[in-house]
Amino acid sequence: MGGYAHQSTKTRSSDIGLTSKGKLSGYSAGFYATYMNDKPEATGPYADLWVLYQHFTDKVNPSNASEESYHSKGWTGSLEAGYTFGLKDWVSASGTQNATRLQLQAQVVRMGVRADEHIDAENFTVQGTGSGNVRTRIGATAYHLFTNPKTGRAIKPYLTLNWYHDTKNFGVVYDSVKDHIVGTRNFGEVKFRIEGKVSKNVNLWGAALYQAGSHSYWNAGAFIGAKVLF
């Protein structure tokens, strides 16, 4: 598997009033393997493994200095396992097939992407920290599948609750001064996702999430996507 990513960010310091813009672009390539049973009711155990090599170009543009550029690269790998329980199956009066499932999950991810050390516009050495972090996750997902057997279209809404633990803090060493993001070593997440099979080869999906940890840390996001099968 492979992919391309592009991200733009903007941060502002409430203490000194300065802003900074950032851009990241790059690629990933790797492989994955999945085990699951082929029961038509989609229940039972599963296991998922993937390994990726990632390479990015990072740019930072502070409001009070010139643009800085550096690279980040490394390997990331994940092992996930879980079990899906069938809660209820039925066919409605209109002929729509309904299936409700509960899936318990556990995952371990090693984050090996490391940012290159670089010199900023003021001639200070900057080095990111946190590479080699091992993130563990335990979670539960409940979903309901609506399938129209006549058209083949399907809709699947999900609700997921996760708990994450990191072994390292993510931060920066700036001219020998260390700082890191607080509140992210342990945090919870609630996520809502909906998938729709609009045709034989096209799937659309959207998701929204909210994360919260200690020290008033929080993060919210929304995503949309499409999958085309050839």
Enumerate the predicted regions with their spans.
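Membrane translocator/pore-forming domains, dominated by Gram-negative outer-membrane beta-barrels
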Residues: 1-230
